[in-house]
């Protein structure tokens, strides 16, 4: 049921081409037909009555000829018939014929078959006529003592409904049900009886619970759930009762039912904020996550733990449970692991960080032993990032983490290796005492690195942080080892020439028998000459990168060689050794330049790389103090500034998060004492059971914006003109995965409009759930029609259609009014999200759909334009505020958002202020949007185009 509907309707479709049966033929079938004919006739009568027909002449026929039958199908249909048939005269008096029906009910309540008794009792719950129910009360009471539980539990429901609607018919119902509950053994019967007492006489329910509070654990789970609900409601309304029932909730945490444990833990948290209660509830949640196999359940319960953590008073308690929380990592689902690691990272403290790191190190090693899988690679990335964060927050742990992680620099998964490299770069800059260890480990794994991107980063780290003579010499040795024989061009040509000297091997292919056109056999053999080639894997890594045409790594190598050569010159006093080392570095650069300009590589060297290597050669040949400072001091300072800015940004975001969580109390705020609080003030807290029920029904209330333009009236769309015969307008109600159109249809003519039908169709990833039913509109009458549309993805959808109708008494064809299109706003499905720079770049490279939007706005300030775009698109700016502060005439920023369907949307804003056009010139530039699906990219682009210009107020 959607949020816009409060009533459940029964819709029975009748084929349009079928001819409606006449009352005479139905009467004949009901009187003289066999059981099968009577069954079909009764079905037709029910459908006709549901569609508005009265059929008063058939009532007595059904009472005389159908009601006495004992066929079970007939009896089921009769229950539906008696529910829908009009039972009163126009002035509200009960029809005389219903007295006969009442007697039939009484006989069914005394029927030996328990199903007929039970279904009759269920039917009586739906009756709204006290005169019909009054004669049946003794029979209903007697059903409480029936041997079968199906009859007894439906008898309880019937008594509860009758007591609620007509209390005078059974005034002693609470007492009767209480006595029944005390002696009842069946779980479902006890549950129904207890539920009735909760709503009809809560004091009796509490009295019963008090007498059996120690046996609650032995009850069935359905009864335990009701007991949890009762305790919550009682303590919510009257907090002084908490001490009386909290022990019962503690006991229910040990229930065998996961549902009971979950509800009991949630109730315990609301009843008590004592550390023991929070710990017990959290422990219960953790056990549920580990034992439940459904990943959706795991995620829901994890969210409860995260909510607990958000409360400052509970965070300290949860910190002691970090190791228990880490047991959840045994779950193979990546999303569960991701949430678990984030929760553990938020809760880790100096008391348990060592244990956390040990567990995470074991998990990292485990990922190396299992078969490679996409989720394994991503999980390894998550572990690396978590260890990275732990090491930054707790520097003492870095020494334990680094040796394990650096093994993964040689990993085939570039993303995980890149995360390790980022961690190593930050660790070597922050922790001076670990530099020797990191350099040593880096030299150990250097030759095994497979990815050119990781190789480039490792080169930079070695060039920047090798400070001793031995380390510098080791780097040069590793570079020579990775480069192979030099000069590269000559050695490659010799290798080629050397492979051509032996006679070309002649290989004979397999002999095949072929059938010629004449039907005879012909023998064919294939002689082929081939030259054996050496596998590329035998090449040293750096040589392989260069021959593949990746000369960006050569530019990085040139910078590294320059740094270590300048540092070697400063460390070693002997001129001969200085010149020898510098010459060796220059020789390596020169041979790479020579290779780049030859025809051997798959791609030639770029001009940028040539310029970089040439610059490094010039620096080494001149050795000026200025260039020495730039290479050996200012490069490191740049990294230091970048890491400091990043750390400051993280601290700022954490501060904002903690400010959101911490409830600030003003000096003049009143203090609430429980003993002095009025009873009605205690109910100010929201009832969690009521909220969850509303959420399940789709009736969750969204907080309306303070802006009056954001009210519901802003979502009303006019569908027809005021001069059209039928006026229509629609309120578009957006839920998470569906849209409800509440269409107001007004007949503006003096004629009766028959078969007035709203015909809708959709464009985009929208699906109409059901066709709205036709209706009849009196002159100047109006009606509301609801249509439900399912949404499957985030893209601009269009709903269009028309209203068709017949004019009563007119012989003309059907009339049609075309409706205006309804455009569905994708902003209802997009939420701001965050990701790392590396993830952004990776997604940017992977996503194939790009939409380039040209900036066309009246906004004159760069920052104002960016904020306007963020507000219009619901995206989050990933570029730090410091990078956007100041004024330089241009701006570049990265934006990111996720849809509720899990789709990612990236945007890059590149804008400038044309200074030559004056201070009032509007912002110009482009916004590039990338997404996995074409619909997302186009929809977001359309949204930006529509909202670029700021409305003047």
Swiss-Prot record:
UniProt GO BP: endoplasmic reticulum to Golgi vesicle-mediated transport; intra-Golgi vesicle-mediated transport; intracellular protein transport
The entry's keywords: Acetylation, Cell membrane, Cytoplasm, Cytoplasmic vesicle, ER-Golgi transport, Golgi apparatus, Membrane, Protein transport, Repeat, Transport
Record's bilayer topology term: Peripheral membrane protein
GO molecular function (one): structural molecule activity
GO CC annotation: COPI vesicle coat; cytosol; endoplasmic reticulum-Golgi intermediate compartment; Golgi membrane; plasma membrane
Modified residue annotations for N6-acetyllysine: 494
Superkingdom of origin: Eukaryota
Modification after translation (UniProt): Proteolytically cleaved between Ser-528 and Ser-529 by CAPN8.
Positions of HEAT repeats: 96-131, 132-168, 240-276, 277-314, 316-353, 396-433
N-acetylthreonine modification, residue list: 2
Pfam families according to UniProt: Adaptin_N (PF01602), Coatamer_beta_C (PF07718), Coatomer_b_Cpla (PF14806)
InterPro entries noted in UniProt: ARM-like, ARM-type_fold, Clathrin/coatomer_adapt-like_N, Coatomer_bsu_C, COPB1, COPB1_appendage_platform_dom
Subcellular location: Cytoplasm, Cytosol; Golgi apparatus membrane; Cytoplasmic vesicle, COPI-coated vesicle membrane; Cell membrane
Assembly and oligomerization: Oligomeric complex that consists of at least the alpha, beta, beta', gamma, delta, epsilon and zeta subunits. Interacts with ARF1 (myristoylated); this interaction is required for binding of COPB1 to Golgi membranes. Interacts with CAPN8 and PRKCE. Interacts with SCYL1. Interacts with COPG1. Interacts (via trunk domain) with ARF1 (via switch I region); the interaction is direct. Interacts with KCNK2 (via N-terminus); this interaction increases the channel-mediated whole cell currents and promotes plasma membrane expression of KCNK2. Interacts with STX17. Interacts with TMEM115.
Misc note: Brefeldin A induces dissociation from the Golgi of the beta-COP and presumably the other coatomer subunits.
Function (record text): The coatomer is a cytosolic protein complex that binds to dilysine motifs and reversibly associates with Golgi non-clathrin-coated vesicles, which further mediate biosynthetic protein transport from the ER, via the Golgi up to the trans Golgi network. Coatomer complex is required for budding from Golgi membranes, and is essential for the retrograde Golgi-to-ER transport of dilysine-tagged proteins.
Name this polypeptide is given: Coatomer subunit beta
Species, as recorded: Bos taurus (Bovine)
